[in-house]
Structures are given as structure tokens and as C-alpha cells.
């Protein structure tokens, strides 16, 4: 019991001390042999270097494995059991040979399997059990197919003053960068014209932000909405013409027979949305069922019977399973229905997360987003990532935290990947760069053209972060 407690306590202390050492590259392909050059950055790490140098000079650069902790060790997260025990127990890190070059520790390792790996540093023997004398740095290995992709953060559901939002469409470019977004869509109600100004202004700024044409599609007064992303034109209907009514009627008649007890207006809304979704898909758009469980004061807009039917229909490429502008309760209830359908049918339905922000005061524009794992940020890559299940719906529960702690929903391997990126501080570094860009873009929007070179310089800095954080053969 005491041994297991020691293992848990040590893990907690290690987790709290993650910033003593730095390593630029943190994500690797599985079964990768590499040389790590780890920098000592904190006072503790500098003291560690002093101790390590003294021990090297004295020829005592390792402790005895199994009795004392090594000066530098390796620990793999999936090592839950000892060789002889069938319960969680203390596993000592494997000693590693290392070299000291200036303030860097140079270590050769083989990172086996798909796993989280820890390089552990110790100053004193474990027999003394002084937990403050351990530090570590974590690495991630992913399968070779997943390693081909890079993480990008974006928000494809938000509104401008072209519909019911507060901001001018082009203003979304600055706030997207402040929020750390790599791609966005400004999806106004009944509107497509806003897209050109956003796309043009983003291209003018050259910050690296990618903008997809987007629209929130529905008919007048409809309770069921969907997102069209990447279409060449708008597909919403501003008024129900005889021709449109004729196109909808066959679908409405089917639904009335299938759901005789459902509200007829709700069924009409679904029939109309189905027609719009099919038109947008024919136009090459990615179509998403958005905010399934949203409410208007006292009632839910889509009954749970209808939510269930809509998701099962697979008329949409994906479901917006987290929406930043509706309550946590509504998001949870939508997720519960979604989860039950996936379990019951054995179907993997793609998900996204979006802010649905109408102004910047609420902070929703940066709190809820989609993480995609793709080769780049083009619309073709985004659409493929969503349909292939390489997206995660994310909601940042505590914006005030020094290190993001979002909730991620999606395929398990991408959720684990997303969690590692949070823990490793990737998005902190990423958002620090894009945040500076966003503030400069606001100045540029106000007429200060002198900031463009600095925006471009920051874009190059972001490119370097992406290149360095992920392993490249030969670097």
C-alpha cells in the first residue's frame, strides 16, 4: 500500500514541476530513435546541472537501478505493473546515459509504441524520499499515419453585423487571431455576402489565418439550423416560394407519417433543412447540424425525438456537439443523445465545436472551438479531417488558467493528442504569437499600415514553432 501511495504522490509532484527543463520537439512518430537536447531553464535545473557535472566528474553518473533513482531516467506511461505484481506499483525509471554540453543535457532514446514518455531528472537518492528533488519532461509518440497531420484550431460558427452579430465581418480576423484560431468561418444567418470581405482582409494581413466561406442555413422562423461551410454561394431561403414549398412537400409528408405526434412546424423545419443541406452538399459544402439542444427561454427548439432522428439520418457530415453560446446543460443533453446513438448503432459520427459568438464581450469567440488534425488549413483538408473523424470539439473551462485545461470530445486517440498538446504548452506558445498578431491587425484595421512587417515576422515565428515542436528526421 505504501509503495503504491509513493508512486501516486511522486506523480503528482512531477506533474507540478513540468517547466524546469525545455525541449523544442515534443511529438514523434512511434518507434523513433532520436537524440534529445534538453535545456535547463529553471534555478532547480541549473542546480541539477551542477550536481550532474560533479557526479560525472566523480564517475558516479547513475544510481543503482531498483534501489535508487537514476540521475537521468526514462519512464513510459503504459508501464502500470511490475513484473511480479498484478496491481499498480512503483516502477523505477530506467537509467539513461547522457552528455552535458553547456546548459543542455544530451540523451539518446528509442521511443517505442504509441505512448507518453517521461525523461526524469533526480538530484538525490530515492531512499531519502524528498519529492522536491525530481523533475521531468514529457514526449508523445503517435502512429505514423497520425503523425502526418498537424493540429490546427478554428471556429466556423460566429456572426457579424450582416445578420445578428455586433462586429463588422472583417473585424473577426483580428479577434480570431487573438483567440488563437488558425481557421474561421463567419456564418451569418441568411447571408453569404460577408465572406468576401473577411477572406480578402485576411489575405491582406498575411497573418496565416485561413477563412472558409460559411453560412448558417435555415428558413424564416425555422427551429432547426445547419452550417454550410465551403459552398460557392448561399443556400438559405428568405421566403417560401411555391417552387421551394413544392420541393419540401415530399419530405414533410414522410415525416408527418413517421412522427404523427410531433409538432408539424418542427417537422416542416426539418424537411426544409434537409432540402437546404442537400443543395449545399451538391455545391461542395461541408454541412453541420448545429446546436441540437438550443432553447428559447422556456422551451427546447428541437424535441429530443427530433434530435435523435436528425442525427441518425446522417444528412449532415457532422454535429456541432459543443456550442459556446448555449448553456452547459443544453450541450450535455445534446451530447448524451449523440453518445447513445453512437453506442447503439456502432457509428462514428464526426463532431465539431464552435463559439456561435455574436459579440466579443462574452469571450465565447475564443472559448469554444474545433481542433483538427490535418496536413494544412485548406478547406479541402478541413472537410476531409471532419468527415474522417480527425476533429475534436473543445471547450476551455477556465480561461484564466496559465495553461489551458479544455474539455475535448471526439475520437479517443485525438482527445489524448489534444490533452498532450495542452499539457506540453503548445497552445500557450501558439496563442501568444497569434495574440500579438491579432492586436497588430486591430491597428492595421484602424489605418496603421506600418504593422504589416511585424505581422509577417510573427507568421514566420509561428511556422518555426510548428516545425520545431514536431519531429523532423535529421534535425
Name what the model sees in each region.
Residues 21-151, 169, 173, 221-232, ...:
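Charged catalytic cores and adjacent phosphate/nucleic-acid-binding surfaces used
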Residues 2-11:
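Sec-dependent signal peptide recognition
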Amino acid at each position: 500500500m505504501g509503495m503504491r501511495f509513493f508512486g501516486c504522490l511522486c506523480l503528482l509532484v512531477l506533474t507540478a514541476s513540468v517547466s524546469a527543463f525545455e525541449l523544442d520537439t515534443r511529438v514523434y512518430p512511434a518507434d523513433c530513435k532520436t537524440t534529445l537536447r534538453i535545456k535547463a531553464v529553471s534555478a532547480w535545473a541549473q542546480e541539477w546541472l551542477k550536481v550532474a557535472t560533479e557526479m560525472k566528474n566523480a564517475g558516479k553518473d547513475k544510481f543503482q537501478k531498483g534501489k535508487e533513482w537514476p540521475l537521468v531516467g526514462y519512464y513510459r506511461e503504459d508501464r502500470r505493473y511490475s513484473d511480479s505484481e498484478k496491481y499498480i506499483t512503483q516502477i523505477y525509471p530506467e537509467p539513461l546515459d547522457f552528455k552535458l554540453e553547456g546548459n543542455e543535457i544530451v540523451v539518446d532514446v528509442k521511443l517505442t509504441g504509441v505512448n507518453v514518455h517521461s525523461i526524469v531528472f533526480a538530484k538525490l537518492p530515492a531512499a531519502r524520499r524528498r519529492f522536491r528533488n525530481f523533475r521531468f519532461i514529457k514526449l508523445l509518440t503517435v502512429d505514423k499515419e497520425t503523425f502526418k497531420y498537424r493540429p490546427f484550431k478554428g471556429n466556423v460558427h460566429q456572426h457579424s453585423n450582416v445578420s445578428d452579430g455586433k462586429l463588422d465581418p472583417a473585424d473577426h480576423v483580428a479577434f480570431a487571431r487573438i483567440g488563437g484560431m488558425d481557421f474561421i468561418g463567419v456564418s451569418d444567418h441568411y447571408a453569404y455576402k460577408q465572406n468576401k470581405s473577411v477572406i480578402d482582409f485576411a489575405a491582406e494581413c498575411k497573418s496565416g489565418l485561413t477563412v472558409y466561406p460559411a453560412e448558417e442555413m435555415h428558413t424564416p422562423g425555422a427551429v432547426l439550423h445547419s452550417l454550410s461551410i465551403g459552398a460557392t454561394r448561399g443556400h438559405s431561403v428568405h421566403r417560401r416560394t411555391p417552387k421551394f414549398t413544392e420541393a419540401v412537400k415530399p419530405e414533410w409528408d414522410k415525416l408527418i407519417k413517421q412522427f404523427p405526434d410531433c409538432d408539424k412546424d418542427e417537422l416542416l423545419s426539418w424537411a426544409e433543412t434537409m432540402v437546404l443541406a442537400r443543395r449545399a452538399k451538391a455545391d461542395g459544402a461541408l454541412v453541420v447540424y448545429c446546436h441540437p439542444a438550443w432553447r428559447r427561454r422556456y422551451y427546447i427548439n428541437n424535441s429530443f425525438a427530433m434530435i435523435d432522428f436528425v442525427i441518425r439520418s446522417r444528412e449532415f457530415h457532422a454535429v456541432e456537439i459543443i456550442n459556446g453560446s448555449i448553456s452547459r446543460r443544453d450541450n450535455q443533453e445534446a451530447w448524451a443523445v449523440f453518445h447513445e446513438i453512437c453506442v447503439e448503432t456502432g457509428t462514428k459520427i464526426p463532431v465539431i465545436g464552435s463559439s456561435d459568438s455574436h459579440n466579443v464581450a462574452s469571450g465565447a469567440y475564443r472559448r469554444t472551438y474545433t481542433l483538427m488534425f490535418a496536413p494544412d488549413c485548406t478547406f479541402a483538408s478541413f472537410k476531409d479531417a471532419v468527415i474522417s473523424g480527425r476533429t475534436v470539439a473543445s471547450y476551455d473551462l477556465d480561461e484564466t488558467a496559465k495553461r489551458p485545461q479544455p474539455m475535448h470530445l471526439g475520437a479517443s486517440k485525438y482527445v489524448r493528442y489534444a490533452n498532450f498538446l495542452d499539457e506540453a504548452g503548445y497552445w500557450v506558445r501558439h496563442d501568444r504569437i497569434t495574440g500579438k498578431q491579432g492586436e497588430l491587425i486591430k491597428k492595421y484595421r484602424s489605418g496603421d499600415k506600418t504593422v504589416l512587417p511585424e505581422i509577417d515576422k510573427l507568421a514566420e515565428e509561428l511556422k518555426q514553432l510548428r516545425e520545431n515542436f514536431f519531429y523532423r528526421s535529421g534535425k
